[in-house]
């Protein structure tokens, strides 16, 4: 884990990378103080809570209490066909852009564009990173090993650029991603269906809150909508910190 000045330098570089990707994709003016939020892990659409993360970001678009722009990233490896050449060219130019690319939600092409769960859910919800959307969502469907052709940073370097990580698991025996987030000084949201969430609650003696560094949500088979709202509300609250 980087410390001191090295941590600050790496966090700044990661934020710059993420904000530049968002601008190059969407053509929107992404503010320097935009709140960067992400979820990551294996591509298990329901078990990892990717579905409810997308739903929460969709609801956040219409939340009037939101104090900042939000750029949300889904970082899960899919059936990747390779980096988008036109996106790579924009990033290599070092310029800022005011027009979007086609499909301004996706960093790498997929072999299964018509069948991908994330893309289909974004289409259903009408989440296409329109100019007036205060919440942008970017799908990064590749392993972050530092040579993906777009971000070109490892996961552990990139996670430093986040302001908040969200792991709303439906099933997770332990959950290393939230543990790694807080190890890198990034607050996170998880659930009590993850072992890490249960541990955080046990340590506090009550449900852990975002002010503690880990927000633990109660999740059951029947409260999907409530979990989506709780994520939305926590991100909106965090935007005012």
Positions of predicted regions on the chain:
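Catalytic cores of carbohydrate-active enzymes across secretory and cytosolic contexts
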Residues: 1-241
């Amino acid at each position: 884990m980087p410390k001191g000045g090295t941590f600050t330098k790496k966090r700044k570089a990661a934020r710059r990378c993420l904000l530049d990707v968002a601008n190059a994709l969407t053509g929107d003016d992404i503010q320097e103080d935009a709140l960067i939020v992400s979820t990551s892990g294996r591509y298990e659409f329901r078990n990892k809570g990717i579905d409810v993360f997308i739903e929460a970001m969709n609801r956040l678009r219409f939340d009037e209490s939101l104090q900042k722009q939000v750029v949300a990233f889904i970082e899960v490896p899919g059936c990747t066909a390779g980096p988008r050449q036109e996106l790579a060219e924009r990033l290599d130019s070092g310029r800022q852009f005011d027009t979007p690319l086609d499909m301004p939600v996706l960093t790498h092409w997929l072999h299964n564009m018509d069948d991908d769960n994330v893309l289909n859910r974004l289409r259903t919800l009408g989440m296409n990173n329109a100019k007036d959307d205060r919440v942008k969502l970017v799908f990064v469907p590749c392993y972050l090993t530092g040579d993906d052709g777009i971000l070109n940073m490892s996961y552990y370097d990139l996670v430093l650029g986040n302001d908040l990580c969200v792991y709303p698991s439906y099933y997770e025996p332990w959950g290393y991603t939230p543990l790694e987030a807080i190890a890198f000084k990034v607050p996170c949201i998880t659930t009590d269906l993850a072992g890490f969430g249960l541990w955080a609650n046990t340590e506090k003696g009550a449900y852990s809150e975002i002010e503690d560094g880990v927000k633990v949500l109660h999740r059951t088979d029947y409260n999907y909508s409530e979990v989506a709202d709780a994520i939305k509300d926590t991100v909106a609250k965090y935007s005012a910190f």
